[in-house]
């Protein structure tokens, strides 16, 4: 399957996992023979992920999840090769991309510290071309000693490079979402992480935020980024991402209110609460808001 059955590259392929028994075998099979090191960093899977990784010849390291950026930075420290390719378990390297990676690393000058790779997102059984889902480039092929992930960005992580970045033409195949329920559930998780990040950054929502941000996102996804090209699916994705914006800012508002109460001891009195009657003890804190919303 690999072009010319070439020798493995001085490359570490790293996959972060949590309960990925369904996707991981296909991911690892797609990079067989590509890299000298295949590393799976697992954060506590209770399915067959670890067993399947080892059966495929991958090294497995266990590390408690402390955030995506933190997890990737820790994985970079474990890379034994000068180049690193980060993959998600539901991504696949095509033979064309395999050949291009080999050529790119063979020709990379000292000034190049990374490569952007386009992503072909497959959702609900089809390739999504509009709405910002294509080419959806990510900085995934990195020089191990010259790349770090910004710790303050937890969703859609940002890489800081000591050097220049070039681009590859052939895409990763991303088997992104197979059902609408799966898509909405993951966006809800991302909203919670983003809300926490907004609070840490000191960004408070204003009244116009709750209407303005979702409206802008809907227009951006469906019109500016031509989500209409994907028909009803494109409309669903645009509306869902607009809802994601609203959900994120509503969660941020709840976090800010909880933080303000915890720091000042001030209690919000519900409308109509009887005068002279003491409010019960509050039990709401940041962790409860995140879990229970």
Protein language model regions, located:
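Conserved sequence signature across two-component system core domains
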Residues: 41-43, 87, 288, 293
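A conserved acidic beta->alpha catalytic loop
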Residues: 30, 42-51, 88
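Hydrophobic/aromatic residues located in beta-strands of well-ordered beta-sheets
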Residues: 13, 38-40, 165
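Catalytic-site signature of metal-activated, phosphate-bearing donor transferases
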Residues: 69-77, 82-87, 94-259, 264-271
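N-proximal low-complexity "stem/linker" segments adjacent to membrane-targeting elements
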Residues: 1-30, 256-293
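Conserved donor nucleotide-binding strand/loop of the catalytic core
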Residues: 36, 50-78
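Acidic helix N-cap motif at the loop->helix transition within catalytic regions
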Residues: 22-25, 47-56, 96-97
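Short, structured coil segments at secondary-structure junctions
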Residues: 34, 55-57, 137, 161
């Amino acid at each position: 399957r690999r072009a010319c059955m070439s020798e493995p590259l001085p490359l570490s392929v790293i996959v972060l996992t949590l309960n990925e028994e369904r996707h991981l075998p296909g991911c690892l099979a797609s990079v067989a023979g590509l890299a000298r090191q295949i590393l799976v960093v697992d954060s506590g899977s209770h399915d067959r992920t670890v067993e399947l990784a080892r059966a495929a010849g991958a090294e497995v390291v266990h590390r408690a999840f402390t955030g995506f950026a933190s997890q990737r930075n820790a994985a970079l420290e474990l890379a034994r090769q000068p180049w690193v390719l980060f993959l998600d378990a539901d991504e696949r390297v095509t033979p064309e991309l395999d050949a291009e990676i080999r050529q790119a690393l063979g020709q990379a000058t000292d000034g190049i510290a990374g490569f952007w790779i386009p992503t072909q997102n497959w959702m609900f059984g089809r390739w999504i071309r509009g709405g910002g889902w294509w080419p959806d480039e990510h900085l995934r092929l990195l020089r191990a000693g010259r790349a770090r992930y910004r710790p303050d960005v937890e969703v859609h992580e940002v890489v800081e490079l000591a050097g220049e970045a070039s681009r590859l033409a052939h895409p990763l195949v991303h088997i992104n979402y197979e059902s609408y329920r799966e898509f909405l559930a993951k966006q809800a998780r991302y909203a919670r992480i983003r809300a926490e990040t907004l609070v840490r950054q000191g960004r408070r929502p204003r009244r116009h935020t709750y209407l303005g941000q979702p409206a802008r996102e809907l227009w951006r996804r469906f019109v500016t980024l031509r989500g209409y090209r994907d028909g009803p699916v494109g409309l669903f994705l645009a509306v869902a991402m607009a809802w994601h914006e609203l959900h994120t800012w509503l969660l941020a508002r709840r976090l800010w209110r909880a933080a303000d109460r915890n720091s000042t001891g001030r209690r919000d009195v519900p409308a109509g609460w009887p005068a002279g009657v003491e409010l019960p003890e509050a039990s709401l804190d940041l962790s409860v808001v995140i879990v229970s919303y």
